[in-house]
Every structure is written in structure tokens, then in C-alpha cells.
Swiss-Prot record:
Family: Belongs to the NAD-dependent DNA ligase family. LigA subfamily.
Entry keyword annotation includes Transferase: no
Catalytic activity field: NAD(+) + (deoxyribonucleotide)n-3'-hydroxyl + 5'-phospho-(deoxyribonucleotide)m = (deoxyribonucleotide)n+m + AMP + beta-nicotinamide D-nucleotide
HAMAP family referenced in this protein's UniProt entry, alphabetically: DNA_ligase_A
Entry protein name: DNA ligase
Organism (species): Citrifermentans bemidjiense (strain ATCC BAA-1014 / DSM 16622 / JCM 12645 / Bem)
SMART domains from the UniProt entry: BRCT, HhH1, LIGANc
Function of the protein: DNA ligase that catalyzes the formation of phosphodiester linkages between 5'-phosphoryl and 3'-hydroxyl groups in double-stranded DNA using NAD as a coenzyme and as the energy source for the reaction. It is essential for DNA replication and repair of damaged DNA.
């Protein structure tokens, strides 16, 4: 391939991969398989390696991280990134509104338009686009000078490397907040603890630590997101107001928090704040208040700035989620992977409306670093529905009777050997028959997100283990009505309901069973990827690490953990027993060499003779792929009544269109 052809191919591959990224991550409608995507990605990387001068500045290969840097360079912001003045009460906001009106010479009856947005608890950054391309990304730093973290920011899928507009401004500087959503944060911390690494105290610390990695490949593995909220220096486009700016940049694919709103006057601000307070615990990310800004930029210029903050904006903070209490005891707790965690038993205290009586101390290294002792007076923090944590010891309140909990020399439950693997902070029980591990494994297996065995709660599982009616998850399926009738307050109807729930779990999806097994580093999302890729437990158990890492989003650490799980004879015996007891996960295996192998179908319109799900399964059983949108790679569009734009696009592209009867005939 000559250089001209290589340049054209690189441009096409970059555009095509970015399109597939949007389909996969934003619309959940992939058009190609992981293997096909990986082939495109590999080809682009190889071409860029052969012709490095042809690599585009917004190449999707930049999202997986570049070479590690020795240290961060300093970047001066185009305009200062100022702090915000804080408000804590309704009166503070009313006073703020009064000040705005006085400065602007407005009467008390006149209303100012304010833009309100959730105050993200993340890391402030600045993105600089030149002629539509992301040129520089930096942290806030001291407000005047920050650290250049462009390569790390490029790994965040929410950030466009090129603005999606035919006429980009010559210069666009955007400020935003990088954050780690709560569910990925919990999963990330769980994986760190299982790997023997110290967990992050909160999502903000995790986001900050991820952004400041010298190796951007590490940042790329962390599910960071961003919301942008303000312009810096701009050239080539004129925004009239904050709301004008925030309604324009999403059309260029720059993300803005959808909860941002223009409200009329101070009452609008008060109503918005109360609404966000109610929504706070239901949001998938942490917020710690509301930011209020005068909307019109002309008014902002008139109001000006103080030395450290603009006059035209204020941050109204939520009430603290912290409280002071006493550590009554510190108790070691054994998890399903054998990790022993110190847990603080607290004098019950109300933290933002929730009674807290326990808090994780994570591990002994963390507990020793914070110097937490029995009898200490401590500050406890609760963030969303994240497990409460001890964030500070009030050393000045010590009486001298406080005691440390030493690292256990034996498992506190089974008395088995305890080890500390080099490079890990976790202390682990390695006893194969540890009942505490068995309890946690069975709890996890029966949980709603796993096998969903209704009625099989912690106390009941504990009793089953104590009576030796079960020893592992497979034994659940041996249980009989007679076994259940041994328990107090267990009537015949309740026993029947439990047995029905256990029986129903035998037909759960394969991904649920994979997740339920509690394989280290395998969460719900990874379990779905594995189920889709391998189609059966037998295929997964036989997979090599190389085959596992060929799946997008499965890295070497996860692959090694899966392979190790299936090397264990004890685990294989449990799987054999599950199969013997009739646990038969729902699997739709693709037919190799089926009549639709390599073919892509799109279904549109109102289907009368089958549902979309039924049609999708029919196609997949014959080796085909059902996509959500029409492209040049679509082979067939099956059109029902009132088919719309997808049918039009199919006709434009010359894709073969089938009726429902045509499709059923093709299936014969």
C-alpha cells in the first residue's frame, strides 16, 4: 500500500471506528462483532505504526492510552479558573440575589435569569479545542496553572477528540468536571480490595488519582466520565449567555449535565435546590450541592470578579453527610474470597437521615494509617448508598483507654491459616472449608442480581450452614421440604415458596450463573460479555487466557482470574453438581455455519407475526447478527407496518427489504 492509499485508509478506519464506538457505548446498538471491531482497530494501529506521520490527531487509538510520561508539565489557563463563593442556607441565596440586583441597579421586583446545575463532586479540568481538534487538556491546579493531562483525558469516551461540526470555532476552551459514577466506583473499589490494593475513600479521590496517572493506559481502564459547564477563551463563535453555551456544545458532542436548567429568579433557584436534594440519592453520581450562575454573559461582565471568585456565581452546598460517633468495637469480617476486613461497630448515629451503626475500615494498613482504635471518637461519612466510612479520628478526645485491633494470626471464624500476599494489603484466610467464606459465597449466589432466589437471606443461609444442610452453592438444590420444616416459624406454604424459588433459579440466564459463581474480578457486565462470547459454561471453562483476552473489555488480570477459577478441582466439582441438580442456564447457542452466518438483519416497523426479540433470536440461532440501525453492511431489512426512516435508508443504500412473510420463508 502506498502512502496516499494508507492516508485514505487511516482516515476511513478512524471515522468508522469512532462511529462504531458511538453505536456501542452511546446507543447500545452495535453493528459488528467484537472480533470485527478488533480487526479494524488492529489494522489502524498497524498503519499508524508504519506511517506515524499520517496518524490523525483525533485517532481512536489515542483512547487506549499512550506512552507513560516522566512527569506532568505545567499549563497556564487561558483565563483563570476561579473558585466559587459558598452558600449554606436559603438566606445566603436570597442575599446573593439581592446583591446581584444592587450591583446591576435592578428593582426588587425584577427577576434575574439563573442557570442552575448539580455541583459535581469530581475534578475540574479545562479542554482546549483548536479548529475543532482537542489540543490540550489540563487540571485546574491553583486556578492559574494546572497540569497537562491531555493523553489521560483522551481516554475518556465522553470527550470528543474532534468537535462534531462542519464549522468549528478557531478556539474553544471548555471547563468541565471529571467524575467516576457510583456503580463503577463500587466495582472498582471491590476489585482493588480483592487484589489486595487499598480502596479509594470516595469517587472524587478515585477520579483524581486516575487523572494523575503518568501512564495513560491505566487511566484508560477506569470508567471516567465528564460533564462540561462553562466556557473559557473562545474565538470564532459568540455565545450570548450561559444557557446559549450549554445548549450549543452538546450538538458538538460535548456532554452537559441534562439536569442543568435556566430558572426565573430566586424562587426558581430555591425550587431547583429542593428538587436536587430529593433526587440526590437516586443519581448515578455524587453531587454535593447546586451551582447558581447569572445567565446572561453581559450581566456577568458587569458584575465582574473578586480576587478569588466571580461575583455572578455561587455554590449552594448540601448539608454535610458526616456525623461524630464512638467506635464501640472493631470486628474482623471474612468475605467470600477470604479477605478479612476490619469493620467498626459504632454507637448508632444519624447521618443525613440514615442510622449508621457500622463502617468498613477496609484493611489493616488503612486502619493503622488512620490510627483507628476501639473507643475512639470518629467522624463518619456516608456518600449516597456507598458503605459508610470512618474519615477522621478526633485524637484530642482520647482518654487513654483506646485499644488497637492487631492483624489476625489465624482466621477469626475457622481458625485456618492467614496469609498476606506480597504486594497486597489484604489479609486472607486460605482455609478451603471456612464457613464465613461459604456464607458470603452462598449469599452472593442467591442475591437478586445473581440467581435471585427469593427468601434465601443471610440469617437463613447461616442456619443452613450451621446445621450442615448445605456446604456450598450446589447443595441449595438438594434441599427438601423436610429440611425446611426443621426451622421455627417455617410453615408448609413458606417451604413450598422457597422450593419454587430455588427451582425457578435453575433456568436463569447464563450470565447470571457466571456472575453468581463469584469469580474474582467478574462483575455483571463482564459476565454478560463472557456469556455472549462463549455461549455455555463448558466453553467458558475450557477457554484459554488468550481466548479470554480476545474479548473486548477483558484484560489479562481478569482473564487470569477466570482461568484460575476453572483450574480449581473444587470449583469444577461444584459446577458438576449444579448440572446434576438440573441447573440449566438459558443459552441460545449460535449455529456455526448457519444459513445467516455473517449476515446482518435490521427489523423495523410494527411486527405482527413475531416480536423483535423472537426475530433476533431466530437470526442469532442461524449465526447471523441483528443490528439496530441500517448501514452499508446491512444485508436485510425486515419491514413491518408503518416502517419509517430505516426503510427509507435501506432503499437509498440498495439493501434488500423483506416482508415478515419473506423473512419466515427465508427461515424455512
Amino acid at each position: 500500500m502506498d502512502k496516499t492509499a494508507a492516508a485514505q485508509r487511516i482516515k476511513w478506519l478512524s471515522s468508522e471506528i469512532e462511529r462504531h464506538n458511538r453505536l456501542y457505548y452511546e446507543q447500545d446498538m452495535p453493528e459488528i462483532t467484537d472480533a470485527e471491531y478488533d480487526a479494524l482497530f488492529r489494522e489502524l494501529k498497524e498503519l499508524e505504526a508504519s506511517y506515524p506521520d499520517l496518524a490523525l490527531p483525533d485517532s481512536p487509538t489515542g483512547r487506549v492510552g499512550g506512552r507513560p510520561v516522566a512527569k506532568f508539565t505545567q499549563v497556564r489557563h487561558t483565563t483563570p479558573m476561579l473558585s466559587l463563593e459558598n452558600a449554606f442556607t436559603e438566606k445566603d441565596i436570597v442575599d446573593f440575589d439581592d446583591r446581584m440586583k444592587r450591583f446591576l441597579g435592578l428593582s426588587g421586583a425584577e427577576e434575574i435569569g439563573y442557570v442552575c446545575e448539580p455541583k459535581m463532586d469530581g475534578v475540574a479540568v479545562e479542554l482546549v479545542y483548536r479548529d475543532g481538534l482537542l489540543a490540550i487538556g489540563s487540571t485546574r491546579g491553583d486556578g492559574l496553572v494546572g497540569e497537562e493531562v491531555t493523553q489521560n483525558l483522551k481516554t475518556i469516551k465522553d470527550i470528543p477528540l474532534r468537535l462534531q461540526t462542519e464549522e468549528p470555532p478557531g478556539l474553544l476552551t471548555v471547563r468541565g468536571e471529571v467524575y467516576l459514577p457510583l456503580e463503577p466506583f463500587r466495582k472498582f473499589n471491590q476489585e482493588r480490595e480483592e487484589a489486595g490494593e487499598p480502596p479509594f475513600a470516595n469517587p472524587r479521590n478515585a477520579a483524581a488519582g486516575s487523572l494523575r496517572q503518568l501512564d495513560s493506559k491505566i487511566t484508560a481502564k477506569r470508567p471516567l466520565s465528564i460533564f462540561c459547564y462553562a466556557p473559557g477563551e473562545v474565538d470564532g463563535v459568540a455565545f450570548q449567555s450561559q444557557s446559549d453555551f450549554l445548549s450549543t456544545i452538546p450538538t458538538w458532542r460535548i456532554p452537559v449535565n441534562p439536569l442543568t436548567r435556566l430558572v426565573p429568579g430566586v424562587q426558581g433557584v430555591l425550587d431547583y435546590y429542593n428538587e436536587m436534594m430529593e433526587k440526590r440519592d437516586d443519581l448515578p453520581y455524587e453531587i454535593d450541592g447546586v451551582v447558581v450562575k447569572v445567565d446572561r454573559f453581559s450581566l456577568q461582565r458587569d458584575l465582574g470578579e473578586k480576587s478569588r471568585s466571580p461575583r455572578w456565581a455561587i455554590a449552594w452546598k448540601f448539608p454535610p453527610r458526616q456525623a461524630t460517633t464512638v467506635v464501640n468495637d472493631i470486628v474482623p469480617q471474612v468475605g467470600r474470597t477470604g479477605v478479612i476486613t476490619p469493620v467498626a461497630h459504632l454507637e448508632p448515629v444519624n447521618v443525613s437521615g440514615v442510622m449508621v451503626s457500622r463502617a468498613t475500615l477496609h484493611n489493616w494498613e488503612e486502619m493503622e494509617r488512620k490510627d483507628i482504635r476501639r473507643g475512639d471518637t470518629v467522624v463518619v461519612e456516608r456518600a449516597g448508598d456507598v458503605i459508610p466510612a470512618v474519615v477522621q479520628v478526633l485524637v484530642e478526645k482520647r482518654q487513654g483507654s483506646e485499644t488497637l485491633l492487631p492483624v489476625p494470626q489465624a482466621c477469626p471464624v475457622c481458625g485456618g491459616e492467614v496469609v498476606r500476599i506480597p504486594g497486597e494489603v489484604a489479609v486472607r484466610c486460605v482455609g478451603l472449608n471456612c464457613p464465613a467464606q461459604a456464607l458470603e459465597r452462598v449469599k452472593h449466589f442467591a442475591a437478586r442480581r445473581a440467581m435471585d432466589i427469593d427468601g434465601l437471606g443471610e440469617k437463613f443461609i447461616e442456619q443452613l450452614l450451621n446445621l450442615k444442610l448445605i456446604r456450598n452453592v450446589a447443595d441449595i438444590y438438594r434441599l427438601t421440604e423436610e429440611d425446611f420444616m426443621q426451622f421455627e416459624r417455617m410453615g408448609k406454604k413458606l417451604a413450598e415458596n422457597l422450593l419454587n424459588s430455588i427451582a425457578a433459579s435453575k433456568e436463569r440466564e447464563l450470565s447470571r450463573l457466571i456472575f453468581a459463581l463469584g469469580i474474582r474480578h467478574v462483575g455483571e457486565h463482564t459476565a454478560k460479555l463472557l456469556a455472549s462470547a462463549f455461549g455455555s459454561m463448558e466453553n467458558l471453562a475450557a477457554a484459554s487466557e488468550e481466548e479470554l483476552t480476545s474479548i473486548r473489555e477483558v484484560g489479562p488480570q481478569v482473564a487470569a482470574s477466570i482461568a484460575d477459577f476453572f483450574k480449581s478441582e473444587e470449583n469444577l466439582e461444584v459446577l458438576r453438581e449444579l448440572k446434576e441438580h438440573g441447573v440449566n442456564p438459558r443459552v441460545e447457542e449460535k449455529r456455526v455455519g448457519g444459513r445467516f452466518t455473517g449476515k446482518t438483519f435490521v427489523f423495523t416497523g410494527a411486527l405482527e407475526k413475531f416480536t423483535r426479540d423472537e426475530a433476533k433470536k431466530m437470526v442469532e440461532l442461524e449465526g447471523g447478527h441483528a443490528a439496530g440501525s441500517v448501514s452499508k453492511k446491512t444485508d436485510y431489512v425486515v419491514a413491518g407496518a408503518d416502517a419509517g426512516s430505516k426503510l427509507d435508508k435501506a432503499q437509498q443504500l440498495g439493501v434488500r427489504v423483506l416482508s415478515e412473510d419473506d423473512f419466515l420463508e427465508l427461515m424455512q
